[in-house]
Amino acid sequence: EMSASLVGSEMCIRDRGEIEMSIADLLKYTLQQSDNNACDILFDYQGGPDAVNKYIHSLGIRECAIAGTETAMHEDLNLCYENWTTPLAAAELVEIFRKKPLFPNVYKDFIFQTMVECQTGQDRLVAPLLDKKVTVGHKTGTGDLNAKGQQIGCNDIGFVLLPGGRTYSIAVFVKNSEENNQANSKIIANISRIVYEYIMQH
């Protein structure tokens, strides 16, 4: 069942107590609001991080490791470094999602639209493109501070649909940053702007 209404933007699953929820709602929570509880429920549904890791590798993405759940990483921040990928591999995964027939179009279209309606990270990849005639779908990731006071990760991956049918996928990761989340988000926005301007000029 992939039909579901949009969820409230200020509520996470933890706030809702014991309820039944569709896969569609779980995907909306995790893709649009980066809800870690929804992420872990989906991990469990798919057989755990190792099963998801094997699936990603089966798609041809090798520079990627999914070793722990969100709950495990919050309990031990060092585990955050066990879950990793590269910006190129992440962008390749977005390209595979957009261009290969991984699953029926109804599910693909649902995930596509859910990413377009992402509610987090409006100051990241999307920021320099808000006044452009483009469609942007993206998914953010925001890490905690490590023992040195550095932000472990400030990330955004997504796709951009340009007028005339051209498209591109992009991933920007800021790791172990001494800056705050706002500054790191601005770094991502600046890179997004540079990439957009380059592509529009070529």
Model-identified regions with their sequence ranges:
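Charged/polar, low-hydrophobicity segments characteristic of intrinsically disordered regions
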Residues: 16-25, 67-75, 120-136
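Structured C-terminal helix/loop/strand segments within mature extracytoplasmic catalytic/sensor domains
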Residues: 44-49, 92, 96-124, 128-134, ...
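Mid-domain, small-residue-enriched loop/turn segments at the edges of structured enzyme/sensor domains
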Residues: 19, 40-102
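Membrane-embedded alpha-helical core segments of multi-pass
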Residues: 34-35
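Carbohydrate-binding/catalytic loop surfaces
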Residues: 73-82, 133-145
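Single conserved hydrophobic/aromatic residue that forms the stacking wall/gate
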Residues: 1-8, 12-13
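Short glycine- and Lys/Arg-enriched binding-loop motifs that mark or flank ligand-binding interfaces
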Residues: 4, 137, 154
